[in-house]
Swiss-Prot record:
This is Trafficking protein particle complex subunit 3. Pfam families: TRAPP (PF04051). Keywords: Endoplasmic reticulum, ER-Golgi transport, Golgi apparatus, Lipoprotein, Palmitate, Transport. GO terms for cellular component: cis-Golgi network membrane; cytoplasm; cytosol; endoplasmic reticulum; Golgi membrane; TRAPP complex; TRAPPII protein complex; TRAPPIII protein complex. It comes from the Eukaryota.
Length: 180
């Protein structure tokens, strides 16, 4: 019995390592295809956005999470459910703005950066920028326009990885006239 449980753990670890290495290969290829880090950062964000737009359906179906009533509740669901479900980590939520429209997600351990060192000639590369795009894309599909950006990164010598989230506005559904 313990042998089967051990296999499941090994399989999960292999899957996460394969994901990490595959992501690294993707970023490496983007660095070869684009002339500067800023263009790579934009592509990672764009790819993440497209993933987030599709991932939200899977998330809502698998998590049974209802509609969030405010940005604080949204932050809790992102940190405690979504990150745990897809990356196996639970970031902490800190640095709320007084207005309650901004917060930080602190990732003590970013699984995307396992086995990674940034070369000196890519100092402005935001290696995990895909995550910001995923957050923006997923939240846009539930009528929330947000800004997400990295403000600290362990790959750049910081102690933790920090994603700053800012609520911009609620997106209103624009239905054609006569439809509801």
């Amino acid at each position: 019995m313990s042998r089967q449980a051990n296999r499941g753990t090994e399989s999960k670890k292999m899957s996460s390592e394969l994901f990490t290495l595959t992501y690294g290969a993707l970023v490496t290829q983007l660095c070869k295809d684009y002339e500067n880090d800023e263009d790579v950062n934009k592509q990672l964000d764009k790819m993440g956005f497209n993933i987030g737009v599709r991932l939200i359906e899977d998330f809502l179906a698998r998590s049974n999470v209802g509609r969030c009533h405010d940005f604080r509740e949204t932050a809790d669901v992102i940190a405690k459910v979504a990150f745990k479900m897809y990356l196996g980590i639970t970031p902490s939520i800190t640095n709320w703005s007084p207005a309650g429209d901004e917060f930080s997600l602190i990732l003590e351990n970013n699984p995307l950066v396992d086995f990674v060192e940034l070369p000196d000639n890519h100092s402005s590369l935001i290696y995990s920028n895909l995550l910001c795009g995923v957050l923006r894309g997923a939240l846009e599909m539930v009528q929330m326009a947000v800004e997400a950006k990295f403000v600290q990164d362990t790959l750049k010598g910081d102690g933790v990885t920090e994603i700053r989230m800012r609520f911009i506005r609620r997106i209103e559904d624009n239905l054609p006239a006569g439809e509801e």
